[in-house]
Amino acid sequence: MNLHEYQAKQIFAQYRLPVSKGIVCHSLDDAVSAIHTLAGDTWAAKCQVHAGGRGKAGGVKLVRSEAEIREFCHQWLGQRLVTFQTDKNGQLVNTIYLEETCLIERELYLGAVIDRSSQKIVFMASNAGGMNIEDVAAQTPELIHKATIDPLTGAQAFQGRELAFKLGLSGDQIKQFAHLFVQLAKLFIEKDLALLEVNPLVLTKQGQLLCLDAKMVIDSNALYRHPELKALQDPSQEDAREADAAKWDLNYVALDGNIGCMVNGAGLAMGTMDIVKLHGGRPANFLDVGGGATKERVSEAFKLILSDQNVKAVLVNIFGGIVRCDLIAEGIIAAVNEVGINIPVIVRLEGTNAELGREILANSGLRLIAANTLTQAAQLAVKAAEGK
């Protein structure tokens, strides 16, 4: 689950991490009032959406007067911001975060992710702050310095000092960085994060380190332990279909193709999408119905797929391991009858009672096309989507 920048910074402040003073604005009146409360004569106005690249898209701007903040609010509040990380529709701007500015001496990068191979947390630091860290890793990997944290022992101050030396910090800056490093690691572990980024982490002209931006992604599997974080969820930033899928424990990701895919198992789902692409098709979604492909879940899965007007055919690829293929076939038939599908549905069943499942589908009298192999299923789906 993603958090907005202002939400992440509020949590940063709880962990004694240095952040600029800011005010959350939900309306034009809030923003006008905020500039009279904040210090200075220049403020940073930031659209709050769950996507990077806001600055390049015009969603972050320095404002110096009431007229400028009015113009910014009129431009963005209630509108959709399109960045390189969003789809063509962008994401809705409901909130603008207005904060005090500072004079910047240097921009750094500091982030943390989970390394699943070592089962540890990896911190990455770089002098290339303010840039996309993926680009830095690809073009100048020598600029990225790493520290590995064992969740059992937590971060140690000496690790922070080592990173500070590598970043060229000196004097009191090293002490500040070590504190920041240890507290970020503590936050990462205690809040069950999947990703944490401060980009940029700036060194001000006064020699103070400041978290100018903040990104937090919480492991959704751990939200049951953090009701206070669950309460921060912003449904307006999520795909409505993906939110509906989550209610039924369906893993759904919308794509831009025209062949709907319904599969049980994430690996098989990705393989199915690959083979559809291999044969010239374009998947409209990733959809994993999981091991318990019941009638109700299959029905909801069909509804999700058909809610996309671009879908011209549906490919169902089920491996009957945990559940029998004959039961899956009955579930598919019941779901098709309930939903009322008027586009081709290609079904490939394999595993326990697969032959019986295919026989049930063939005798259903419905517009279901049975396939014996995944290759055949993909080819049939591509032809059906093309109207052949």
UniProtKB/Swiss-Prot annotation:
UniProt GO MF annotations: ATP binding; magnesium ion binding; succinate-CoA ligase (ADP-forming) activity; succinate-CoA ligase (GDP-forming) activity
Chain segments annotated as transmembrane: none
Catalytic activity reported: succinate + ATP + CoA = succinyl-CoA + ADP + phosphate; GTP + succinate + CoA = succinyl-CoA + GDP + phosphate
Pfam families cross-referenced by the UniProt entry: ATP-grasp_2, Ligase_CoA
Pathway stated in the Swiss-Prot or TrEMBL entry: Carbohydrate metabolism; tricarboxylic acid cycle; succinate from succinyl-CoA (ligase route): step 1/1
InterPro entries in the cross-refs: ATP-grasp_succ-CoA_synth-type, ATP_grasp_subdomain_1, Succ-CoA_synthase_bsu_CS, SUCC_ACL_C, Succ_CoA_ligase-like_bsu, Succinyl-CoA_synth-like
Binding site for Mg(2+): N199, D213
Assigned keywords, A-Z: ATP-binding, Ligase, Magnesium, Metal-binding, Nucleotide-binding, Tricarboxylic acid cycle
Annotated ATP binding sites: K46, G53, R54, G55, E99, C102, E107
Protein residues bound to substrate: N264, G321, I322, V323
Gene Ontology CC terms: cytosol; succinate-CoA ligase complex
EC main group: ligase
Record EC number: 6.2.1.5
An individual GO BP term: tricarboxylic acid cycle
Necessary cofactors: Mg(2+)
Entry's cofactor comment: Binds 1 Mg(2+) ion per subunit.
PROSITE patterns the UniProt entry points to: SUCCINYL_COA_LIG_3
Complex formation: Heterotetramer of two alpha and two beta subunits.
Purpose: Succinyl-CoA synthetase functions in the citric acid cycle (TCA), coupling the hydrolysis of succinyl-CoA to the synthesis of either ATP or GTP and thus represents the only step of substrate-level phosphorylation in the TCA. The beta subunit provides nucleotide specificity of the enzyme and binds the substrate succinate, while the binding sites for coenzyme A and phosphate are found in the alpha subunit.
The family this protein is said to belong to: Belongs to the succinate/malate CoA ligase beta subunit family.
Name used for this protein in its record: Succinate--CoA ligase [ADP-forming] subunit beta
Upper taxonomic lineage: Bacteria, Pseudomonadati, Pseudomonadota, Gammaproteobacteria, Pasteurellales
Gene field: sucC
